């Protein structure tokens, strides 16, 4: 896929991609779960309720995921579970931040040559709404909470609970073993979506999934590669452009500055909205985005998506050039039929982006975006079950998430 991304141009859905899509049967279950171009195959694994180590059932609400280690043909992945519930942690006590909470991560091992799932274990628990995150250059996973609250009474999934600890943080998960379940406080307390690290500088870039206003952040660590040691949190300011939610032009380039966040831990505001960090950044002159989701560093750029940004409110893809301190609008969807609500995003090793869709459309799609701005549909969710794998229903409207390369 990467070679096509790197070589092709054009714009919109005029790009042919790999050709028409048709149902393809899963190599593991024999079910036609996806629609793909001719010649592509896939294997499903890690279904909800399937046992992990210690016979722990795999939680539902699969979300962000990344490859944290490769040993020969075996890849190790860490996957988020965006659970918003107070039924308790599924991870061991030592890896549980708040024992009342049901979100967290699972670490998985897969043999790519044999096409076989080797097993997995709970590696972080006691968190809430672990949405996306990101892989670090040193081989760990950063898991982001998209939920902000002070300790105390709270409603989770329409049920009343009492949180033992504050929430709205990023946690680090190793490739082997389990997380220390220690929040990385320098990354702030806000509705985190994703994070990506620039290997050249060690700077962390973070997105915030709030509507109608959101910020794009960076954290400059005191010690590169050791975010637990602290750092400086800042929000992006596009000079002369305080509002980037709409009214922008594809290819437009804006000069970037950064404003400091005085108190990164003041996210749980008095209004109960979890917008304390955002308000600090905007008051200091930071620029407004809306519903920032995926972020990935590569090719000397930092790409990130605004799910409902743009004049049609169908989504934007932004590219920040840290070397030049320039922000560029790389793509904007003009219509929900073209692309609706881009979410998780990953850079192909050969260039170009893979974009996960999370919209109100009846079928969710996986897209490729070439360096030249050409967009094409690569895959469709085709999951319809009648009791197979323990599930029944039409799941074609469920979001894509966790796209990654090994």
Predicted regions and their residues:
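Sequence/structural signature of beta-propeller domains
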Residues: 1-406
